[in-house]
Amino acid sequence: MKVHEHQAKEIFARYGLPVPKGYPAFTVEEAVEAAQQLGKFPVVVKAQIHAGGRGKAGGVKLANNLDEVQKYAAELLGKTLVTFQTGPEGLPVSRIYIEEGTNIDKEFYVAITLDRSKSKLIIMASSEGGMEIEEVAAKNPEAIITEVIDPFLGLRPYQAREIALKLGLPKNLLNKAAGLFVKLYELYMKEDASMVEINPLVLTKEGNIVILDAKVDFDDNALFRHPDIMEMEDPTQESELEVKAKQYNLNYIKLDGNIACMVNGAGLAMATMDTIKLAGGEPANFLDVGGSANAEQIANAFKIILSDPNVKAIFINIFGGILRCDRLAEGIIQASKEVNPHVPIIVRMEGTNVELGKKMLAESGLDLIPADTMWEGAKKAVELASKA
């Protein structure tokens, strides 16, 4: 689960991490009031969306007086902000953050995340802050410093100090920066985060270090332990279909293609999308119905898929284990009768009760296209989608 910048900074402040003073605002009047509470200019007016690249997209403004705060707040609130991370559809700005200005001398990048190749947490840092880390990795990979964090010992103070030293921070701030990194790790562990990022961490002209932008992603599977964080969820930052899918306990992510996928298991779902790409098509979604799906959930999955106007074909690829093929067939038949699909449906299934499942589909009277292999199913889906 993602949270907004102002929410991430609230959490950071609980751990004693240095964040500038600021207030969220949902209306122009609240924005002006927030600026008045800060009591000095300049202030920064920041659009709050779950995506990076806000500055380049015009979502971060420097205001030198109340009139400018009012003007920028009116411009941003209610706007759909398009950045390189949002896709062409953008994300709605329903709130902004009014924050005190900071005299920036130098910018840095710091993050803690899981390195899947090492199966351990790492802390990453770079002296090239303010840029997207992917851009730094592509253009200047040697500028990225990494330290592997021992799962039993945690981030050790000497590691944190070494990172601060390699970043080139002034000697009088090395211990302070090292303490900041250790607190960041503490936050990561205690709040069940999957990623924490500071971009940028700034050295101010007054000689302080301040967190200018904060990002936290939380592990969805651990949210039951954090009701306060669950309350921070903003459904406006997700597509309507993704919100519906959550209500149905389905793992759904909308993509830009025209071939919908319905699969059980995340690994098979990704392999299915890769196969569609290999066959020359573009997947319209990631959809994992899970191993315990029933006929009703299959029907709900169909409804979500068919709500996407871009879908020109549906490829159902199921390996029947816990989710038996006859149960899948029952769900497909029920869903087809309820929603009357207007696009071709290709079905490939293997595993438990596969013959019974195929028999049920064949006798259903529905216009379903069988496939014996994933490759055959992907090719048929691409061919039929191109004709639609």
UniProtKB/Swiss-Prot annotation:
The keyword Cell inner membrane does not apply. It comes from Persephonella marina (strain DSM 14350 / EX-H1). One of its GO terms (biological process) is succinyl-CoA metabolic process. The keyword Nucleotide-binding applies. This is Succinate--CoA ligase [ADP-forming] subunit beta. Its EC number is 6.2.1.5. It comes from the Bacteria. Pathway: Carbohydrate metabolism; tricarboxylic acid cycle; succinate from succinyl-CoA (ligase route): step 1/1. ATP binds at K46, G53, R54, G55, E99, T102, E107. One of its GO terms (molecular function) is succinate-CoA ligase (GDP-forming) activity. Keywords: ATP-binding, Ligase, Magnesium, Metal-binding, Nucleotide-binding, Tricarboxylic acid cycle. It catalyses: succinate + ATP + CoA = succinyl-CoA + ADP + phosphate; GTP + succinate + CoA = succinyl-CoA + GDP + phosphate. Heterotetramer of two alpha and two beta subunits. Belongs to the succinate/malate CoA ligase beta subunit family.
